[in-house]
């Protein structure tokens, strides 16, 4: 007996030494370099796409969008709609757990939608959910949502990245601090959030999709300088970077260890003008500024060709988008219009940007130079996420300092209402939503509201066309470009890519 035990120990020691002779499997840790900071990890209270994209690490919705921006089931298995368009009955996926062990069920859906649709919570995404009259639990796997009025894009709202399912236990535990303590059903859970440096997430062992996630961790690292972001890829400090500085795209494409990807986008870049303030209350001034910008040159100077001049206020790939003849570059016409408007010598103003990365800086400097040619002196300020939240998103019309504002918008629901209503409806002036032009037109408001009440495609087309025709004519914006999305990644990273709305898809990401 003694001899047998000795042999077992010798065998065990031999096995241990043989294991030690081989390296342990390398951890699959990925660093993603992104262009700006995160504002919050509560998707219902984030106005920026990046914060919502990172929140997809922890959170999932009932529905989502695929790479073509078409609705797909996620935590829902299907739905039906009543004949009057008011009631949505949704069947839920069963056997799913939140990261704190709580069950995902109809009660959890109700807790989230009750919170989102309650104006007393003052959530930035409230406007998405204000049409919900009530949410009821039919049984643990079935939830019934009743709307105040028909809303034909409602499933797209439920597919929006903001509509995340948060653990009700976590909501109760953390309250208003839930943005610092995300708990969802997603593939990763929060490990560290250093608010000035990075968000690190780690694999959630109890994730409901078998075999996923394949990565051990993702570190989301804000890197505002374009050149530094690109350099991190080349040195191996990052395995994925977005956005890629356009001027470095060709260089990165030559790197045998990297893959450069230019993908379609619904990201429209524009400058809004505060039409409630002089001189932008004058239509001739707004026309003049549109004639003053050489968009073809802007595409080359700031975007290295990875963009196209805007032909409307809705990107062409969005349903019901209208295209128009682009504004020609005509500084002489611009000066003539300024003279007619009572500003023969131009004027001074401010031009703010919603981002401070290098591409935004180039757009600001280019625009500043173009405006100077027609006598307009623009003082430029590139804002970080905190400044933008405080000075632009957080202030109403009377206290707002916004005059000209360079920013971008992607309709993250994949449909026309979200491309128009948040930016042009009278009810969506900041701080409610993102109508930073403080634009208001009763016919536009009426058309946008009516388009949501009909399921007739021809009537929708008519209403959305009329609204866009009016907006294009009244010019509360200087539409600039629709971007192409340029990202790059290590060739050994697969399944990680950019969505057309500038969000990220990484469900099946792997490091090989």
Curated annotation (Swiss-Prot):
Residues 1-26 form the signal peptide. GO terms for biological process: dipeptide transport. It comes from the Bacteria. SUPFAM superfamilies: Periplasmic binding protein-like II. InterPro entries: Peptide/Ni-bd (IPR030678), SBP_5 (IPR039424), SBP_5_dom (IPR000914). Its main location: periplasm. It holds the Pfam family SBP_bac_5. Gene3D superfamilies: Dipeptide-binding Protein, Domain 1, Dipeptide-binding Protein, Domain 3, Periplasmic binding protein-like II. One of its GO terms (cellular component) is ATP-binding cassette (ABC) transporter complex. One of its GO terms (molecular function) is peptide transmembrane transporter activity. Part of the ABC transporter complex GsiABCD involved in glutathione import. Binds glutathione. NCBIfam families: PRK15413.1 (NF011942). The complex is composed of two ATP-binding proteins (GsiA), two transmembrane proteins (GsiC and GsiD) and a solute-binding protein (GsiB). This is Glutathione-binding protein GsiB. It comes from Salmonella typhi.
């Amino acid at each position: 007996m003694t001899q047998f035990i000795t042999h077992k120990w010798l065998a065990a020691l031999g096995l241990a030494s043989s294991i030690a002779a081989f390296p342990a499997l390398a951890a699959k840790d990925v660093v993603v370099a992104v262009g700006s900071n995160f504002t919050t990890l509560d998707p219902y209270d984030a106005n920026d796409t990046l914060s919502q994209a990172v929140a997809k690490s922890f959170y999932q919705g009932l529905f989502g969008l695929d790479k073509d921006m078409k609705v797909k089931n996620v935590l829902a298995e299907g739905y039906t709609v009543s004949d009057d368009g008011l009631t949505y009955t949704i069947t839920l996926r069963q056997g799913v757990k939140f990261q704190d062990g709580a069950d995902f069920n109809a009660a959890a859906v109700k807790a989230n939608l009750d919170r989102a649709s309650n104006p007393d919570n003052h959530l930035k995404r409230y406007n998405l959910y204000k049409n919900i009259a009530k949410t009821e639990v039919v049984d643990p796997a079935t939830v019934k949502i009743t709307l105040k009025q028909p809303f034909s894009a409602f499933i797209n709202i439920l597919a929006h990245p903001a509509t995340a399912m948060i653990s009700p236990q976590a909501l109760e535990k953390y309250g208003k601090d839930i943005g610092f303590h995300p708990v969802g059903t997603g593939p990763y859970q929060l490990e560290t959030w250093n608010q000035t440096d990075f968000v690190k997430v780690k694999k959630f062992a109890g994730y409901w999709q078998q075999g996923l996630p394949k990565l051990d961790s993702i570190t989301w690292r804000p890197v505002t300088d374009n050149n530094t972001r690109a350099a991190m890829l080349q040195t191996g400090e990052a395995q994925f970077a977005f956005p890629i500085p356009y001027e470095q795209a060709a260089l990165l494409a030559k790197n045998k260890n990297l893959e450069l990807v230019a993908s379609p986008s619904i990201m429209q870049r524009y400058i809004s003008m505060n039409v409630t303030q002089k001189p932008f209350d004058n239509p001739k001034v707004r026309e003049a500024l549109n004639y003053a910008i050489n968009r073809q040159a802007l595409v080359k100077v700031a975007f290295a060709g990875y963009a196209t001049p805007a032909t409307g206020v809705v990107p062409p790939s969005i349903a019901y988008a209208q295209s128009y003849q682009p504004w020609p570059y005509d500084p002489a016409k611009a000066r003539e219009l300024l003279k007619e408007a009572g500003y023969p010598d131009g004027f001074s103003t401010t031009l703010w940007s919603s981002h401070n990365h290098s591409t935004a800086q180039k757009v600001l400097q280019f625009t500043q130079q173009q405006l100077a040619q027609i006598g307009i002196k623009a003082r430029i300020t590139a804002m970080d996420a905190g400044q933008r939240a405080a000075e632009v998103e957080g202030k109403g019309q009377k206290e707002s300092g916004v005059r000209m504002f360079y920013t971008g918008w992607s309709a993250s629901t994949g449909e026309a209402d979200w491309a128009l209503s948040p930016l042009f409806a009278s009810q969506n002036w900041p701080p409610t939503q993102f109508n930073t032009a403080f634009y208001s037109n009763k016919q536009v408001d009426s058309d946008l509201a009516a388009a949501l009440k009909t399921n007739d495609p021809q009537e929708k087309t008519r209403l959305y066309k009329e609204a866009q025709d009016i907006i294009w004519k009244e010019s509360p914006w200087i539409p600039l470009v629709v971007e192409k999305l340029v990202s790059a990644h290590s060739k050994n990273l697969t399944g990680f890519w950019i969505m057309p709305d500038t969000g990220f898809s990484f469900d099946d990401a792997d490091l090989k």
